[in-house]
Amino acid sequence: MNKQSLFENIKRKKSFLCVGLDTDIKKIPDHLLDDPDPIFAFNKAIVDATADYCIAYKPNLAFYESMGVKGWIAFEKTVNYIKENYPDQFIIADAKRGDIGNTSAMYARTFFEELDIDSVTVAPYMGEDSVTPFLSYEGKWVILLALTSNKGSHDFQLTEDANGERLFEKVLKKSQEWANDEQMMYVVGATQGRAFEDIRKIVPNHFLLVPGIGAQGGSLEEVCKYGMNSTCGLIVNSSRGIIYVDKTENFAAAARAAAKEVQEQMAEQLKAIL
């Protein structure tokens, strides 16, 4: 999916919501535990309930890998289900990969060839040769970690050099030598607030994947005020605030209502550019 197609979906649905599929076997409704594949059963119900209101899904690989082979099977089934039934949805493998070149090449093959996923999150710490293998796939996206929403982001990402330049700013500037805004996005946490203003000075046209609204306390209004550009430029993720709002047999309907509420807020924000 290219940048223009992504923007067209945003305009059509009046939404830039990404639903995070951080599916924890210990948190799904009890009645699903009797299913042969409870993780997939939960994901399928969530996807069917929320697809009208979002433009992307983001399975977090850690939740699937923690279950071994069964978890990976559930992940693959989830990806295939979304592609077959909701082909307009942008799929993000939240894997945070990044290693020496030949290892990154294998990661890229996994997500882009074997699974045919639209995008993957990548850690930039090891530099250009750890990222470029992911960029060799036409039509696929790298979503590079820039400024995350966790407390530990202060340990490295916000440290300054002698000239006052912060590490995340170096990442943004250097990585633009590797790919343009048709192939690279950046992760910027919703809790970073005014930092979006600084980020847009460096990458005015790139899409930003923004986790951290909902359960993590980020403000959608603030993200849009400082981060939205003329083509929206935002994919805002909510995981727990949608998929875990209810643990009864009505969980899917509750997730749909939660997604609809966020979409309605996003529709208001989009009036500024549409």
UniProtKB/Swiss-Prot annotation:
The keyword Iron-sulfur does not apply. The keyword Hydrolase does not apply. Keywords: Decarboxylase, Lyase, Pyrimidine biosynthesis. One of its GO terms (molecular function) is orotidine-5'-phosphate decarboxylase activity. Pathway: Pyrimidine metabolism; UMP biosynthesis via de novo pathway; UMP from orotate: step 2/2. The active site is at 96 (proton donor). Signal peptide: none annotated. One of its GO terms (biological process) is 'de novo' UMP biosynthetic process. Pfam families: OMPdecase (PF00215). It catalyses: orotidine 5'-phosphate + H(+) = UMP + CO2. Its EC number is 4.1.1.23. It comes from the Bacteria. Belongs to the OMP decarboxylase family. Type 2 subfamily. This is Orotidine 5'-phosphate decarboxylase. It comes from Bacteroides fragilis (strain ATCC 25285 / DSM 2151 / CCUG 4856 / JCM 11019 / LMG 10263 / NCTC 9343 / Onslow / VPI 2553 / EN-2). The lineage of its organism: Bacteria, Pseudomonadati, Bacteroidota, Bacteroidia, Bacteroidales.
